[in-house]
Amino acid sequence: MISECLDRSQHFGVLRGKEQDLAEIGCTAEILTVTKKYPDGRMDIVTEGRARFEVIQLNQERSFLQAEVLYLHDQPEIASKAEIAQALKLHGEIMTLAGAEPEKSSEIDERQLSFHLAGSLPLDLDFKQTLLGMKSEAERLRAIISFFDTILPTMRRTVHVRRKAGGNGHAG
């Protein structure tokens, strides 16, 4: 399948598998680079998500799944500047607590901010799947802000405890 996509400059669809089921909402992926080719035909690839879709009907005639899909488009509701700023602030704090360098907001496309923020962190897969099905950037950003607000107190406590333990009880 990957060879076909490369030969034809096509994207492929990605669906989350859970137990014996597949999610109904997925995302197309564009192959950016092939980092390694193996003698048996397998490849290590770097991809980037492009377009969300809903599966209408699966086709199992080939060695890989194919599907008839309906592409999903966002409703025109846009996030407020305050919501964007809050999401970036919380994301930056999470990155800092995790020991990573927060990104500069000027380097992020605000039209796809929710997907960028969710994709840059190892968040709960059920939460990410829920985001994929949401109909507007504003709705996704509000969900991300709520999620970050929920996880940050635990992260702050964990980092504080680690610092205190690492300082033999003398860290402040």
Q: Regions from the language model: what does each represent?
A:
Residues 1-172:
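N-terminal low-complexity, acidic/polar interaction/targeting segments
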